Design a protein with these regions (language model features):
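Intrinsically disordered, low-complexity, repeat-rich regions
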Residues: 1-157
Length: 157
């Protein structure tokens, strides 16, 4: 995999996740909904771009970091951008999001895919995935992690 000699990478690099006509852009909404700074959300979008490349070019199933997964989830909400623009024109492939079905075998499968994704990232992009976005597997899949999206304005006391 060499993204710099690949038309797919050229198309991904040119793809703009933000519609400049929007009062609240994709990246701004990603930041707002996750309590991130705009700068951090911009970094997440770039890592999402890299993940999309790996999803099509790696020879194995890929699993995103939690932060990259949040970008993917939000992008799926922008259905025309995701399906009509990204998948149809840029990726030229329908990329479906497959969540876990639960259970130990699924946990093992996603852990293995996450480790393989980070390895492919290193080989493809020639650097370590940023640790604050792509944490070690034991952090990403920590058993004590219990993720839940909550409206803090309505439910924080």
């Amino acid at each position: 995999m060499n993204p710099h000699q690949d038309p797919l990478w050229d198309r991904l690099s040119a793809f703009n996740f933000d519609d400049t006509g929007d009062a609240l852009t994709f990246t701004q909404r990603l930041a707002r909904e996750n309590g991130w700074s705009l700068g951090f959300a911009q970094r997440i979008v770039e890592e999402y771009r890299r993940f999309l490349y790996l999803a099509l070019r790696a020879s194995h199933s890929v699993t995103p970091s939690d932060a990259v997964d949040q970008a993917w989830h939000l992008h799926l909400v922008y259905s025309r951008s995701y399906w009509d623009n990204l998948c149809a024109q840029v990726l030229q492939h329908r990329l479906h999001h497959g969540p876990t079905r639960g259970g130990q075998s699924e946990d093992d499968r996603f852990l293995d895919a996450y480790e393989a994704t980070r390895d492919s990232y290193r080989r493809c992009f020639g650097s370590e995935p940023p640790a604050d976005i792509w944490p070690e597997p034991e952090v990403r899949f920590a058993p004590q992690a219990r993720w839940q999206r909550v409206d803090l304005a309505a439910h924080w006391y």
